[in-house]
Every structure is written in C-alpha cells, then in structure tokens.
Amino acid sequence: MERLAFKMKLNKGQKQAYKERHDQLWPELKQLLKDNGVSEYSIFIDEETNTLFAFQKVSGHGGSQDLANNEIVKKWWDFMADIMQVNPDNSPVSIPLEEVFYME
C-alpha cells in the first residue's frame, strides 16, 4: 500500500461549495477510484490560504492522478472548475507532496 499526498488550491469563499459537492460524490466516481486502487482518500483545508491537502492510500500505481483520460474524471473536473484553481483542461492544479514523516 502506497501513501500519496498532494495539494490543490480552492478559490476564496468556496469551502462550503467544495464540501457540499464532495458530500454528494458521484457513485460512479467513487467506484472508479476504488477500482483503480484508491482505498482511502481524505482532503483537508488550510482556511488561511485556501490550500487543500489531499491524502490517498493506493495499491498499484498512481491513484487518482493516473485517471486523467477517464470521462467520469473529466466531467468531475468540469463540475469543480468554477471553485478551484485549474489547468487549461480543467484538471485541478495539483502539486505532489513529499512525505517527511510516517508513524505506523
């Protein structure tokens, strides 16, 4: 099991919309993530900077970051693009984070 972490940026004032959309995560997206080895996925927010910190436990390679060509993922990106910083293809601007400590 591999642990992955990355950060994204939420637009100012969009915390509630972000939370509401994720509270109603599409079942087909959730299943896609599970089918591609994502067993745990958490996202935290630093409200001072609107930085989102995501953490995933994955088996296999890459987790959600390898699903960029999937139509369900692309539709989710389009759905989320108005409330967060995105690339030209509407994928979230995502910066991988290096693990510097782990305790089991």
Curated annotation (Swiss-Prot):
UniProt catalytic activity: alpha-L-rhamnose = beta-L-rhamnose
A single GO cellular-component term on record: cytoplasm
Subcellular location field: Cytoplasm
Pathway assigned to this chain's UniProt record: Carbohydrate metabolism; L-rhamnose metabolism
Active site: 22
Isomerase is among the record's keywords: yes
SUPFAM superfamilies: Dimeric alpha+beta barrel
Pfam families for the chain: rhaM
Record-listed E.C. numbers: 5.1.3.32
GO biological process terms on file: rhamnose catabolic process
Binding site for substrate: 18, 41, 76-77
One function term, GO molecular function aspect: L-rhamnose mutarotase activity
Function: L-rhamnose mutarotase involved in ulvan degradation. Ulvan is the main polysaccharide component of the Ulvales (green seaweed) cell wall. It is composed of disaccharide building blocks comprising 3-sulfated rhamnose (Rha3S) linked to D-glucuronic acid (GlcA), L-iduronic acid (IduA), or D-xylose (Xyl). L-rhamnose mutarotase catalyzes the anomeric conversion of alpha- to beta-L-rhamnose.
PANTHER family registered for this protein in UniProt: L-RHAMNOSE MUTAROTASE
Assembly mode: Homodimer.
Family as reported in the entry's similarity comment: Belongs to the rhamnose mutarotase family.
The protein's name in its UniProt record: L-rhamnose mutarotase
Organism: Formosa agariphila (strain DSM 15362 / KCTC 12365 / LMG 23005 / KMM 3901 / M-2Alg 35-1)
Source organism phylogeny: Bacteria, Pseudomonadati, Bacteroidota, Flavobacteriia, Flavobacteriales
